[in-house]
């Protein structure tokens, strides 16, 4: 990890099973002995800033504030003190809650991790090794359905209409009181009987508040017509008029003209693979061609595909390992590797991993492909400095929600003070235009060594770490 993921052209025999089986023998050094290496690595990719949205959701706490504002509206209604501002406070927190939910929805989080153990030995001419590795590659996302999004938006619109109607009704009542509307109604009734408009009635013709009353009444009617698209207004009006005699705000769902789900819930989607590999690798120098080493790894693979969706409110972490969402496959496969030392300073490496292409079906009938992965590398060593460059010749198919990738890796290692090795690198995804820098340090002696690696790319929200120990005999 620390050198950008390089290791195909030049690496210790303890890494051969994972990078290039030909490196079980080091042609330029004739490395001999036995090495044991436990390792652990993890990488998290959050390109859509799901974690940032999650932190904001928790900090903003809009859902709880929505609940509080709704309870406040119910209390005000039950005491005949409900005002439009109470309803608008509900719509304000509802909009914030909706925006926070949208900040979580459909933003995949990709995680990969591995751990295992390798054992290798070399006599300087041939080499072999065994390894066991457990690794998981997958991704997850939370999705708020389009129907639920529409429900939230409709609810906000309805509450805004109710608030506007309250304001409009209040304005109409105030105008009616100003102009003495009850008296005006009486004068109109008298004129209807006598057929003559009295002078008092005629005095209302130019009254400045009559026109605003008419306009406010028309607007109130328009709002009522718009609200009628969502509610059975006659029944709702009767319920609202009895507000002071009820303990609870009317259940608006009872008056809707359309059906809704009982609960608002998001769906969690997870997909990926959980793989156990057990392999044996062999390598040998080719006497007829100086500097050339060939190697192969034969491996048994047990692969569990993970593919499920579940309601977020009912989800628990134990379901990640629930076998009802997994489908197990077994296979034999192999890696082929070549290592060639041009001279004491330059080395070339080529590896093809998983030479047998396979397709695996998930429990939901989807397909996950395992195709061969070819990688070419070159390394240069001089004194205390090592430089490496490697390129994927094939595309790595995505196993979770991440896109397909093809990497160019660059790395450097400097052997410094007291056997410490300082490493740095960068891994560039030529398929998607992203890059991830890395760094690390190794220290120890010929019999034992500890390597630490870190990769972080704030621009693309990617972070990872690795640790491995090596004992030589």
What are these model-derived regions, one by one?
Residues 1-34, 462:
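Outer-membrane beta-barrel biogenesis signature
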């Amino acid at each position: 990890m620390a050198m950008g993921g390089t290791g195909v052209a030049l690496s210790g025999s303890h890494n051969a099973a994972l990078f290039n089986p030909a490196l079980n023998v080091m042609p330029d050094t004739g490395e001999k002995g036995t090495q044991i290496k436990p390792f652990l690595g993890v990488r998290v990719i959050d390109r859509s800033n799901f974690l940032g949205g999650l932190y904001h959701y928790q900090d903003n706490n809009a859902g709880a504030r929505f609940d509080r504002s709704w309870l406040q509206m119910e209390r005000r209604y039950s005491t005949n003190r409900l005002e439009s501002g109470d309803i608008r406070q509900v719509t304000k927190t509802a909009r914030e809650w909706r925006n926070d939910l949208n900040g979580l929805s459909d933003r995949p989080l990709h995680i990969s991790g591995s751990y295992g153990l390798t054992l290798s030995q070399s006599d300087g001419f041939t080499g072999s090794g065994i390894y066991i590795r457990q690794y998981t590659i997958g991704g997850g996302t939370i999705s708020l359905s389009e129907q639920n999004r529409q429900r939230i938006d409709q609810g906000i619109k309805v509450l805004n209409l109710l608030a506007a109607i309250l304001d409009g009704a209040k304005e109409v009542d105030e105008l009616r009181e100003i102009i003495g509307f009850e008296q005006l109604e009486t004068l109109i009734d008298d004129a209807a009987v006598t057929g003559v408009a009295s002078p008092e009635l005629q005095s209302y013709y130019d009254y400045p508040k009559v026109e605003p009353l008419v306009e406010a009444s028309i607007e109130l009617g328009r709002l009522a017509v718009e609200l009628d698209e969502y509610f059975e207004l006659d029944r709702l009006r009767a319920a609202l008029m009895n507000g002071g005699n009820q303990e609870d705000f009317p259940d608006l769902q009872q008056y809707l003209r359309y059906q809704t789900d009982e609960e608002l819930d998001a769906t969690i989607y997870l997909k990926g693979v959980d793989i156990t590999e057990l392999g044996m690798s062999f390598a040998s120098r080719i006497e007829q061609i100086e500097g050339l080493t060939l190697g192969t790894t034969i491996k048994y693979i047990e692969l569990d595909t993970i593919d499920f969706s579940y309601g977020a409110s009912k989800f628990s972490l134990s379901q990640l390992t629930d076998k009802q969402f997994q489908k197990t496959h077994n296979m034999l496969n192999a890696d082929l590797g070549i290592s060639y030392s041009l001279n004491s300073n330059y080395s070339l490496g080529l590896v093809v991993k998983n030479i047998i292409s396979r397709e695996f079906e998930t429990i939901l009938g989807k397909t996950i492909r395992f195709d061969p992965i070819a990688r070419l590398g070159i390394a240069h060593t001089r004194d205390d400095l090592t430089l490496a460059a490697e390129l994927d010749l094939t595309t790595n198919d995505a196993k979770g929600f991440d896109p397909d990738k093809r990497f160019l890796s660059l790395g450097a290692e400097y052997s410094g003070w007291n056997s410490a090795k300082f490493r740095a690198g960068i891994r560039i995804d030529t398929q998607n235009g992203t890059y991830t820098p890395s760094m690390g340090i190794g220290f120890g002696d010929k019999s034992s060594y500890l390597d630490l690696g870190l990769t972080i790319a704030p621009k693309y929200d990617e972070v990872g770490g690795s640790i491995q120990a090596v004992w030589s005999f």
